[in-house]
Amino acid sequence: MISFSSFYQQIADSTLQHWLEDLPAILGKWQREHKHGNLPKWEKVLNKLNYAEPDSVDFVDSVTIGSGSQLSAGQQQKLENLLRLFQPWRKGPFNVHGIDIDTEWRSDWKWQRVRQHISPLAKRTVLDVGCGSGYHMWRMLGDGAARVVGIDPSPLFLCQFEAIKRLAGNQHPVHLLPLGIEELPPLDAFDTVFSMGVLYHRRSPIDHLYQLRDQLRMGGELVLETLVIDGDENTVLVPEDRYGKMNNVWFLPSVAALMLWLKKCDFTNIRCVDVDTTSLAEQRSTTWMPNESLVDYLDPKDINLTIEGYPAPKRATIIATKNQPNFDLI
């Protein structure tokens, strides 16, 4: 069974220590509820990942674990076969002992767009909301974060993360907890909070912004990346049914509307640092994720539209600072 005890020990004397009042019970409940399904099978695969410490790691320019020379060809093939049991791999890429995990998303491209605009992560305590299998968490660690905590309720993402962590060495201060943000108490403790690719999946985007705010210390930085559309501060797209074949997309605001929402939620220093239309090269099917991908979600006659006729995915990155609430507006 995947254990979270090392995380409890690491935060016992940190700014996150008051989380220990609730967290063990919450995660204990999660473990009891996931005794069946695929989790036990994936945990058996994790237990087979008994490899020596890698001779090198790189989290600064990539997520690369091992030089590729430690394993024989046979050992390398065995490891690849084990890692493929965690398919589909969506966020990456990873290179593990010379094995290229070619994920659906080129998450490294997103990181290159984002990292140049954010406050330096050196010595910061970071929260990554909706972290997937944790690719960006490793890059945050590579940029000097003191501790990175990711939350995502998916058991598969947890097991993919655990696989990478066990191969990288468990000593790294990076942890994934299988939780949604609604299960977090207001911690007011993180220096930087990331929410990338989450807001449009929330039925109440304003509530999500307040939940993110509740995790930041005063003066902490929010890095928000989400789908947007063109328009003024009153423009918001609410798909009638599906968007890009997804039935869990609720609100796509314009950049101006999103910045207004953040202002209303008592964020300051709000600025849009990047707007980028998702390319077919950034999100695509691979042998590690052989299912449908972006090309299947777009109009085959016009890739500027989704298959439903909405504007094709365009993503904006907004950075903002947690400010004292304006009680005159409450």
UniProtKB/Swiss-Prot annotation:
Residues passing through the membrane, by range: none
Keywords: Transferase, tRNA processing
Gene Ontology molecular function, alphabetical: methyltransferase activity; transferase activity, transferring alkyl or aryl (other than methyl) groups
Catalytic activity of the protein: carboxy-S-adenosyl-L-methionine + 5-hydroxyuridine(34) in tRNA = 5-carboxymethoxyuridine(34) in tRNA + S-adenosyl-L-homocysteine + H(+)
UniProt GO BP: tRNA wobble uridine modification
Binding positions (carboxy-S-adenosyl-L-methionine): K91, W105, K110, G130, D152, P153, S154, I181, E182, M196, Y200, R315
EC number: 2.5.1.-
Assembly notes: Homotetramer.
Job of this protein: Catalyzes carboxymethyl transfer from carboxy-S-adenosyl-L-methionine (Cx-SAM) to 5-hydroxyuridine (ho5U) to form 5-carboxymethoxyuridine (cmo5U) at position 34 in tRNAs.
Family stated for the protein in its record: Belongs to the class I-like SAM-binding methyltransferase superfamily. CmoB family.
Protein name: tRNA U34 carboxymethyltransferase
Organism of derivation: Shewanella denitrificans (strain OS217 / ATCC BAA-1090 / DSM 15013)
Gene that encodes it: cmoB
